[in-house]
């Protein structure tokens, strides 16, 4: 086999691989634009799931703070006590596009997670979440800051 024939076969194989890759990419996009529209929804669901998990993490940290010092705590105190990591430091930390706020005193706490887009933490989630010390149930509102009166998740 001559060098020209080998180069021709390699070129044809590369072209076939390129075509196969294009076909695979097209089929993976699930009917073109439908697949592309599904991606932001999946990311939004992941952001919301992360916010809900963070609320539960905060609830666990609050339980530990109450047991240790007989009082609930704000985010900075929970971080200083080692119950939350540094991502939660500050008055209203923003994690994965959700702004967390906490109101805490000796006897109770309430925490909200509201979508907030920042340059470093864009969000695709749209629902608002609430959890407090009374029952540990996550409540959800589709349009505004959630409260205890909103439906449970």
Short names for language-model regions:
Residues 44-55:
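Membrane-proximal amphipathic alpha-helices
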Residues 24-27:
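C-terminal motif of bacterial Sec signal peptides marking the signal peptidase cleavage site
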Residues 37-41, 60-125, 133-135, 142, ...:
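Extracellular/periplasmic head regions of type IV pilus-like filament subunits
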Residues 20:
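Small, basic N-terminal interaction modules of short regulatory proteins
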